[in-house]
Amino acid sequence: MKETDIAGILTSTHTIALVGASDKPDRPSYRVMKYLLDQGYHVIPVSPKVAGKTLLGQKGYGTLADVPEKVDMVDVFRNSEAAWGVAQEAIAIGAKTLWMQLGVINEQAAVLARDAGLNVVMDRCPAIEIPRLGLAK
C-alpha cells in the first residue's frame, strides 16, 4: 500500500473500533488507543474484557456487532490467527478499513476484506504512521 493511500485512510477515518483493547496502561493497545483519542479520533474499545466498562472515557463493547454506531476503521490488536474472524466481523458491520497492527499478518484475512471492498493495512501501527506522515495534531 502506498503512503498516500495510508494518509488518505488516516485523514478520512473518524471512528475506530479497537479490537483487543486492554484496560492495562502498560499494554500497547491501551497506549495506542490513548494516542488516537489525543489525535481527535473517536475510538471504541472492543474486547470481552472491556464490555460494559469505560476505558479512557469511552464505553467498551464485547464484539464489533455490539457497537451501536458506524465504524470507519477496525484496528486489530489480536494475534494473526484471530484476524480472519475480525475481518469477517468488520465486513459484517460495514467498516471501510481493516487495519492489522504491527506483527499482525494474515494474508487470508487481507484478501477476504479486500474482496469485500475494504481498505486493508497490515503490519503497521497508526500511532507510528500518523507522525511519520506528518499528520499529527
Curated annotation (Swiss-Prot):
Gene designation: yccU
Organism: Escherichia coli (strain K12)
Higher taxonomy: Bacteria, Pseudomonadati, Pseudomonadota, Gammaproteobacteria, Enterobacterales
Record's protein name: Uncharacterized protein YccU
A GO cellular component entry from the record: cytosol
SMART domains given in the database record: CoA_binding (SM00881)
